[in-house]
């Protein structure tokens, strides 16, 4: 079966003055439809770059990243943009952008502009998804400027889910300080994926975010190691190459 998302020998470097920073080194992975994949790694391990490549926001220097069998590097920037607004949704908890004078329901509804829905239909879908993530009718009418971190994170999830993606990519999805709020959010995320038969690719330095995933991977020093055994993390030894600096 063709994987929904695949990396094959992907390498990514970033220029830094006269040097090149090696971020990902010959990474290969597969994410199949309806399967959840977790990537555990410390800061600057390469996991955020991995997710940017998976979403088509960035392209590899070598190797291939394919979605549904199609190489993203062969797509136009417009095609990748439409993919990211449709079949793929990307969420990062520290990437909150909202009009402070906009209501929560309108903030979610406006993300559906490419779906061909009327505004009434968009608002109806937004209200339904907000309810599913624990934001009731009253909360949906609040202004986005009034939301705390926990509420913003749930609204961001609703905005991602409203587009009904095949693959949801999450980078450190829950940064709220309260452990109970984080655990509640992770449980909500897993339930949403199951109910929608949606694939997940989640990267975090917090193991709680990765509980219950089907495949758990570890990234360190730009290299990825995987195991098919649920709940097992394989850590790679740190390794530096002469003349190459690593950055996540």
Regions found by a protein language model. Give the residues of each.
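Helix-to-loop junction immediately C-terminal to a conserved catalytic motif
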Residues: 55
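Q-loop/switch helix immediately C-terminal to the Walker
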Residues: 94, 101-113
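ABC ATPase NBD coupling module
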Residues: 72-88
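Conserved ABC ATPase "signature" region
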Residues: 121-138
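Conserved ABC transporter NBD signature motif
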Residues: 63-71
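Conserved ABC ATPase signature
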Residues: 143-149
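Conserved catalytic motifs of ABC-family nucleotide-binding domains
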Residues: 164
